[in-house]
Structures are given as structure tokens and as C-alpha cells.
């Protein structure tokens, strides 16, 4: 229910252009593995579609990749295209394991082992600041691409996590705080729209050519 379709489509375009692609599932361990391989020099460009682990780190979910998530590509000075995939959600296990302080929040039971919680306006502001603080220190080519119509499959209009105010807090905090050395691109699509995934892949290809 997050941004899988976007990743699949972008991967297809990159592979059609003879780019060897490794995909990571952003489950905490996935983000850690990706950052580690970038630091070891095995990866020479990053398309960071699903930054959802930042929400878990900042809000207190179960799938955090730690405070250094979104720093390896910057530190290794490789080109990166970043988006806001699944920043509408914080992950927990079965519903009964959700911390008491979150019991009255907008919760979505994805399956018996996964409960998702919608990020609030205030949480989205904190997440946006974290992204800006990390990316603003970059000296290589970086694009931050915003899908204005929804950051996950369930954050689009008519779906359970649609929240215009929370999304606007995320987007406007980025607009206010991102430095001009970062290419900020806003597109009037949802993250899983083909036009958005195409734009992500083409932007990364432009950095590689």
C-alpha cells in the first residue's frame, strides 16, 4: 500500500537504459543495508523513492533505519534523486502492540502483523526538517521530487490516509527550508502514477549522463 509500483516502474526505465539496479525494501534493515553498501562504494547513484523509515525514526515506529538514514549518498558525493514515499505512515506490528499514546490516532490494519499510523501535520513538519537538514549539506547532484497528489497508495484522495493538511505541512516545510543547491521538483501526480516514476528515473539518468 506504499510506493511499490513507483519503484517497479522506475526500475524498468533504468534497466532499459543499461543501468544495473539493486532494489531495497524500506523495512529498517533495508535502509541500513542500502546506506551501508553506498558507504562501502558499491553503489554510484541513488534513487531514494521510499523514505518512510524517517517517519519511523522520528515518530517512534518499528521500522526505523536509525538517525543516519539519508546521509550515505550525501557523504559519498554520489548523485541522488530523493522522494517522499510513504511518509504518510509509521509502522507497527499487530494492532494490540501499538503504544498506548497512539491508540486514538488514525490507524490502518494492513494485515494481522502490520498496523500503519497516519503521520500528523506536526510530525510531517519534523520529518521535512530532517530531510532538509540532511540534503542541504550535499555537494553532489541532488533532486528532491514531490508527488503533490499523494505520497503513498493510501494517501491519495478517497483513501484512508488522505490528509491534505498533513501533506501540505510536509511540502511547505520542505519549500521553506531546502537550499537552492538542491533541485526541488514538484509534480502534480501521486507517487505511483507512471508519469511520476518516469520523471524520477529520467532525472537520475540525466545526472548519470
Give names to the regions the model predicted.
Residues 5-11, 33-37, 57-60, 92-96, ...:
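Short acidic, glycine/serine/threonine-rich loops at helix termini
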Residues 6-7, 41-44, 102-108:
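A broad, low-specificity signal for short, low-complexity segments enriched in glycine/proline
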Residues 10-20, 174-181:
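Short helix-loop-beta junction
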Residues 12-15, 47-50, 111, 151-154:
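A short alpha-helix capping/helix-coil boundary motif
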Residues 20-24, 29-82:
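A conserved active-site cap/scaffold subdomain adjacent to cofactor or substrate pockets
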Residues 64-68, 72-79, 84-209:
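C-terminal non-catalytic interaction/assembly regions of soluble proteins
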Amino acid at each position: 500500500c506504499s510506493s511499490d509500483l513507483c519503484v517497479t516502474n522506475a526500475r524498468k526505465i533504468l534497466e532499459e537504459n543499461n543501468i544495473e539496479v539493486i532494489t531495497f525494501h524500506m523495512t529498517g534493515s533495508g535502509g541500513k543495508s542500502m546506506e551501508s553498501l553506498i558507504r562501502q562504494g558499491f553503489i554510484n547513484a541513488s534513487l531514494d523513492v521510499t523514505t518512510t523509515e524517517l517517519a519511523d525514526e522520528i515518530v517512534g515506529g518499528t521500522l526505523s533505519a536509525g538517525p543516519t538514514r539519508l546521509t550515505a549518498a550525501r557523504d559519498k558525493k554520489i548523485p541522488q534523486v530523493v522522494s517522499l514515499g510513504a511518509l504518510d505512515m509509521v509502522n507497527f506490528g499487530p494492532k494490540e502492540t501499538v503504544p498506548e499514546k497512539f491508540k486514538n490516532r488514525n490507524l490502518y490494519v494492513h494485515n494481522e502483523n502490520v498496523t500503519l499510523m497516519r503521520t500528523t501535520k506536526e510530525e510531517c513538519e519534523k520529518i521535512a526538517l530532517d530531510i532538509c537538514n540532511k540534503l542541504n549539506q550535499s555537494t553532489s547532484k541532488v533532486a528532491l521530487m514531490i508527488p503533490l497528489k499523494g505520497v503513498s497508495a493510501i494517501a491519495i484522495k478517497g483513501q484512508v490516509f488522505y490528509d491534505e493538511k498533513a501533506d501540505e505541512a510536509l511540502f511547505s516545510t520542505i519549500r521553506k527550508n531546502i537550499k537552492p543547491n538542491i533541485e526541488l521538483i514538484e509534480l502534480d501526480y501521486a507517487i505511483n502514477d507512471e508519469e511520476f516514476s518516469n520523471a524520477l528515473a529520467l532525472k537520475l539518468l540525466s545526472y548519470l549522463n
